[in-house]
């Protein structure tokens, strides 16, 4: 059963990569904006990993959109610089942190 499963997975990956190659131009443009180093060495595997990681994130975003949005903003690092410049940014950050808790 394991051998059949691996063969089926390989076939699915082949069909997935073939279908992704037709969509690669648009995907490559979006990937380069976030991180070209991630898409350059292994584009096929990373694209499959991105597709497999999307559904759970969407399910979580439906439950708590504010918490994820605040987490993503804090993860980028740009918000921390803006908060240092403006006092209003500090107040917004505290409110988002309280909502997250």
Curated annotation (Swiss-Prot):
It comes from the Eukaryota. Residues 88-101 have a biased composition (Basic and acidic residues). Residues 76-101 are annotated as: Disordered. This is Putative uncharacterized protein CLLU1-AS1. It comes from Homo sapiens (Human). The lineage of its organism: Eukaryota, Metazoa, Chordata, Craniata, Vertebrata. The gene is CLLU1-AS1.
